[in-house]
């Protein structure tokens, strides 16, 4: 296990910069998830740490040693990819042991490491099976076991669950979390799935167009998003974000309604409200008028999708699962003043109150 340090890491292709100066420290034993939409640079950043992509500027340190010029095999890391890449003619045991045999470790050491990883990943019943006799989730566990038996300084995972169905992803998330708790392995994990990111990470790197928009704990990212991009990306349904005109402790909403709110400054602002931080207004209470277009019922909860009255600005509300509201109904929603998010309309950065 080891600390990973990124110091102003940059990547360019033909003069076009795709990774823009990322600096962070991943502590020994920490589980950090890089999350963002397709094309944001998350896999490129992981591959730079692994040595599969050259670093254009800045440095990467693993275990206190700058590794910019080292080959992947010299960095003491192990990787797990989206595709399992198991040898089809080898058993689970042989797949997990193969790298150790190439490294010429003693047979007893190889057997001990494979047995330890198989126990941790609940693979003992499958050690003599070929990959074709395994489910997708079992194959992915074999790929992880093959990485773990090497006992690397750091474990890097690139979208390891994206080929699995929804039920298997939930199961594998739990197993990955339990595996990390047992091993204390320094882990860098890439995903586009915010649920994976929020449930697995000690800290998140939220990326957008090669920029680390925010590096923080999942709770901090959710409760205090550093930018409008982060606010809209993390959370499901996404945060409602729209432009308001602020002045003298009130905001004028799209459609013309006026709402008293504590504002950080006057002028145009971008206001963010999560669906769960809106409640139905009491009679005579100033509120956001919303006309529903549809209601999505999920059992315990329901979500109402509509528009702010008098505008084309979309709005999502969380409703009780027993709600009888339907298309065309008008709802007056009041935001929780403790959960207001304001963003600069030009830079998109968070404005503190």
UniProtKB/Swiss-Prot annotation:
Function (record text): Part of the ABC transporter complex UgpBAEC involved in sn-glycerol-3-phosphate (G3P) import. Responsible for energy coupling to the transport system.
Question: Pfam families, alphabetically?
Answer: ABC_tran (PF00005), TOBE_2 (PF08402)
Give the GO terms filed under biological process for this record: carbohydrate transport
Instruction: Give the top-rank taxon of the lineage listed in the UniProt record for this protein.
Output: Bacteria
Keyword set, alphabetical order = ATP-binding, Cell inner membrane, Cell membrane, Membrane, Nucleotide-binding, Sugar transport, Translocase, Transport
Q: What is this protein called?
A: sn-glycerol-3-phosphate import ATP-binding protein UgpC
Q: Per the record, what are the reactions this protein catalyses?
A: sn-glycerol 3-phosphate(out) + ATP + H2O = sn-glycerol 3-phosphate(in) + ADP + phosphate + H(+)
The keyword Nucleotide-binding appears for this protein: yes
List locations, semicolon-separated.
Cell inner membrane
Encoding gene, per UniProt annotation: ugpC
Cellular component terms per the entry's GO annotation: ATP-binding cassette (ABC) transporter complex, substrate-binding subunit-containing
Its source organism is: Paracoccus denitrificans (strain Pd 1222)
Per UniProt, what is the membrane topology? Peripheral membrane protein
- ABC transporter domain segment(s): 4-234
